[in-house]
């Protein structure tokens, strides 16, 4: 018989915590002075809430607060406990960040060295009836990482700090899009559990498309337990039980739900979820599952090695984005913040998010929302851009962490791929690691042996990939475009974005291009006067190596170099959107050779110039609107093929697509003269792509600088083609008129084109940071109109540059 009682030690549960600096480079007045703390929380957020530090995101405060990562911190609380007659008491910490010593009533009860796992400490002999004092002392993470390096040796990595020495969120030490705010704290819930006999240790409910739910329940027993226990599993109107002999650590219970409704990713069906209840005496565990099967086909074919993700036997073209921690201080995230950000992916037409290996295993709130909204999750194990020791003590921590992560996340219907690491196999092959490694193991044993074995044991229904990128053959370069998954980073780092068309990748799991955040986001934290891309504070919020130089070089012949800071902001945002859209249009035109694109990246963790589509204040950048267009279920593009132009159509729906397509060659001038027009019927089967060659009457321009193609389907799908870059394109100044009208929730701005108006964008946050707009990057031919709908603000008295922008105003 189980009798489990829980005492919540979080702030929300009523516990009063303080944090104090113990020793290190903290200001003298903070040493040994208690500051009110929140649990779950972290040092930075506690000091910020108490007014002890300025906002780390503002200005150049980041570097002024680096002392926090080198200071030892102590969290302390007292709590009252009443003896309850149970045999065993344990302190359960779901997350301690990272290197910590835990004491209760002055007695050490445990030490930790891994942010990514939970800990359970036996406190039966230490806990007393009445008042108890709990102290958790954290080493400064930067100091701890450096101390570990000094002890066990250095391993190649890509950061100022040796983040790979610790099992801690890598990007907390800074990244090329994130701040260096290495912190510490009790970052997930903490509690006392008191129990007798037997308790539930973990539950793994694995549901398949056949309606069968296999639930694996791990049990913990006291030494004196002598009675059989009964485990009951309820799901979908079915109930099954199993009797368990004392001491047995795992029991499997099988339920079959007749005619179970299948779970599908968005765009392919519904997302029915079934409540699962597991009972053991008076203890109850609840969760949700979706019945589905997921596979990845990597069987070699005539073109190399595919990477085809299928759900319930149906191939899925992946339209995705990479996900980084949604706040540099992850304890500020909750179910609502996750839902808002994941909705950004849904609204952009995505069906997959890749949880990147330099972050965290997100809370269940993240995966719950993905389950509900039909967003597949590609989950990296947490190894990124570095070599990792395979020796103790790190190896045991890696195994414990991986077992816990797979056990916790395996229930989620959205979980589609376990991935061993981010770029580490590629790094070993190509990033000059071999000399400093001097023959030492560097992590391959994790990715090729330990982790796949753990996944096969605990979550055999979910595919595993050793890395990203990965060719699925140790004798083929891991970033070979013909095999498996590919990261394309010569675009952005070295070459023009038109290079995307030189690749024919089977699956692209990273690619991207930088651009600044919204103007209001940028100016809320950057206070240089005058504002300049190379200003002191601006550079604090540009973390990429030579980032501003790459922004300028990336313009190529596409757009002119900016004349002022307003033009810089608009030009680089526009170029980011165009570059990424260019790549996705090309990848989708290659279907079925190409089976997916996962852009870097969806989100930001603070206000910064980055690759994100949605900035650190949650404002959708022009890139996001470009993604919404190119991730549409049905996409029309114009693609060059050898010596001709084709209309490429990708139909990513379950219904055949038949539409009349009109291709018009027009003048860019004010009259918008129609120079030639061709019409044809496009027939695209379900989940297919076709290409139609264009006749020379429209494909060949008489005056390339003054002409363009307008391609429109009768069902509303459309695209444009230009014969020259904007720097040579004859775009009329003053190519449109505007009118603003109030609406109940904001206002409308209607734009009427008098000539080709290219890439119209309205930025209401420049007038009011709370304002949001529903559309962006709209191209109009002469005589056409578009209405931007703005919410959260009142109609302005004036509209013009820099609030309303277009490509026209950059070249005139």
What are these regions (language model features)?
Residues 115, 176-179, 264-265, 322-335, ...:
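The substrate-binding groove and active-site-proximal loops of carbohydrate-active enzymes
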Residues 298-431:
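Substrate-binding cleft of carbohydrate-active enzyme catalytic domains
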Residues 19-21, 25, 182-185, 453-455, ...:
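Substrate-binding clefts and catalytic carboxylate motifs of secreted carbohydrate-active enzymes
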Residues 49-50, 94-97, 139, 290-295, ...:
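Short, solvent-exposed turn/loop segments enriched in Gly/Ser/Thr/Pro and often Arg
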Residues 389-474, 618:
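Active-site neighborhood of glycoside hydrolase catalytic domains
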Residues 351, 416, 462, 593-595:
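Short acidic/polar active-site loop segments enriched in Thr and Asp
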Residues 98-100, 143-144, 297, 325-328, ...:
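Flexible loop/turn segments at secondary-structure boundaries
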Residues 1-352, 482, 489, 589-590, ...:
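Secreted/periplasmic carbohydrate-active enzymes, especially glycoside hydrolases
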């Amino acid at each position: 018989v189980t009798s489990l009682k829980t005492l919540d030690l979080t702030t929300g549960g009523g516990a009063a915590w303080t944090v104090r600096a113990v020793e290190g480079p903290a200001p003298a007045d903070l040493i040994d002075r208690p500051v009110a703390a929140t649990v779950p929380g972290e040092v930075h957020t506690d000091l910020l809430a108490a007014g002890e530090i300025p906002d780390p995101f503002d200005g150049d405060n980041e570097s002024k607060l680096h002392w926090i990562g080198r200071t030892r911190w102590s969290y302390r609380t007292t709590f009252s406990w009443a003896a309850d007659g149970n045999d065993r008491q344990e302190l359960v910490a779901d997350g301690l960040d990272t290197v910590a010593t835990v004491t209760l009533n002055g007695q050490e009860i445990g030490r930790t060295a891994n942010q990514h796992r939970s800990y359970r400490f036996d406190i039966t002999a230490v806990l007393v009836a009445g008042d108890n004092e709990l102290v958790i002392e954290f080493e400064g993470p930067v100091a701890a990482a450096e101390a570990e390096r000094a002890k066990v040796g250095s391993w190649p990595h890509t950061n100022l700090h040796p983040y790979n020495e610790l099992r801690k969120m890598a990007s907390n030490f800074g990244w090329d899009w994130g701040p260096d705010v290495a912190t510490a704290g009790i970052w997930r819930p903490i509690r006392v559990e008191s129990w007798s006999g037997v308790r539930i240790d973990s539950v793994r409910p694995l549901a398949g498309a056949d309606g069968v739910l296999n639930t694996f329940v791990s049990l913990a027993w006291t030494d004196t337990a002598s009675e059989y226990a009964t485990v009951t599993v309820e799901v979908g109107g079915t109930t099954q039980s199993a009797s368990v002999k004392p001491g047995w650590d795992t029991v499997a219970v099988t339920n079959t739900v007749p005619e179970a409704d299948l779970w599908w990713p968005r765009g392919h069906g519904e997302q029915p979820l079934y409540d699962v209840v597991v009972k053991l005496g008076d203890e109850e565990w609840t969760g949700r599952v979706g019945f589905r099967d997921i596979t990845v086909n990597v069987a070699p074919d005539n073109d190399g090695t595919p990477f085809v993700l299928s759900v319930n036997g149906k191939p899925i073209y992946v339209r995705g984005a990479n996900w980084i921690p949604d706040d540099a201080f992850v304890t500020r995230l909750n179910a609502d913040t996750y839902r808002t950000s994941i909705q950004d992916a849904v609204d952009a037409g995505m069906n997959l998010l890749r949880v990147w290996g330099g972050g965290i295993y997100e809370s269940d709130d993240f995966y719950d929302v993905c389950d509900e909204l039909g967003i597949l999750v590609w989950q990296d194990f947490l190894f990124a851009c570095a070599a990792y020791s395979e020796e103790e003590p790190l190896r045991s921590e890696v195994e414990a962490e991986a077992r816990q992560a797979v056990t916790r996340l395996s229930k989620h219907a959205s979980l589609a791929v376990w991935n061993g690491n981010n770029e580490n196999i590629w790094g070993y092959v190509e990033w000059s690691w071999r000399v400093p490694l001097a023959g030492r193991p560097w992590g391959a044993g994790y990715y090729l042996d330990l982790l796949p074995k753990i996944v096969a044991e605990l979550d055999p229904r979910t595919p595993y990939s050793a890395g990203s990128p990965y060719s699925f053959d140790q004798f083929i370069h891991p970033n070979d475009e013909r095999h498996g998954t590919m990261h394309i980073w010569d675009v952005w780092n070295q070459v023009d974005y038109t290079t995307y068309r030189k690749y024919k990748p089977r699956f692209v799991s990273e690619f991207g291009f930088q651009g600044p955040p919204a103007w209001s986001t940028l100016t809320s934290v950057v206070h240089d006067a005058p504002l300049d891309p190379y200003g002191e504070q601006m550079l604090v919020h540009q973390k990429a190596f030579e980032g501003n130089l790459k922004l300028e070089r990336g313009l190529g012949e596409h757009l002119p170099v900016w004349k002022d800071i307003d033009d810089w902001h608009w030009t680089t945002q526009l170029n980011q959107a165009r570059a990424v859209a260019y790549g996705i249009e090309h990848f989708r035109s290659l279907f079925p050779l190409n089976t997916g694109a996962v852009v870097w990246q969806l989100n930001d963790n603070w206000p910064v110039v980055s690759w994100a589509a949605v900035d650190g204040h949650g404002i959708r950048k022009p890139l996001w609107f470009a993604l919404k267009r190119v991730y549409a279920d049905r996409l029309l593009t114009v693609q060059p093929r050898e010596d001709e132009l084709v209309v490429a159509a990708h139909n990513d729906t379950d219904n055949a697509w038949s539409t009349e397509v009109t291709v018009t060659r027009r003048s860019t001038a004010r009259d918008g003269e129609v120079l030639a027009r061709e019409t044809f019927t496009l027939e695209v089967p379900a989940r297919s792509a076709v290409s139609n060659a264009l006749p020379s009457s429209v494909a060949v321009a008489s005056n390339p600088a003054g002409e363009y193609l307008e391609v429109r389907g009768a069902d509303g799908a459309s695209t444009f083609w230009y014969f020259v870059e904007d720097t040579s394109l004859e775009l009329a100044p003053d190519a449109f008129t505007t009118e603003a009208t109030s609406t109940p929730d904001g206002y409308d701005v209607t734009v009427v084109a008098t000539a080709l108006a290219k890439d119209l964008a309205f930025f209401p946050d420049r007038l009011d940071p709370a304002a949001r707009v529903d559309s962006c990057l709209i191209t109009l031919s002469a005589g056409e109109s578009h209405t931007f709908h703005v919410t959260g603000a009142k109609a302005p008295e004036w509209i013009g540059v820099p609030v309303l922008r277009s490509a026209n105003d950059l070249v005139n």
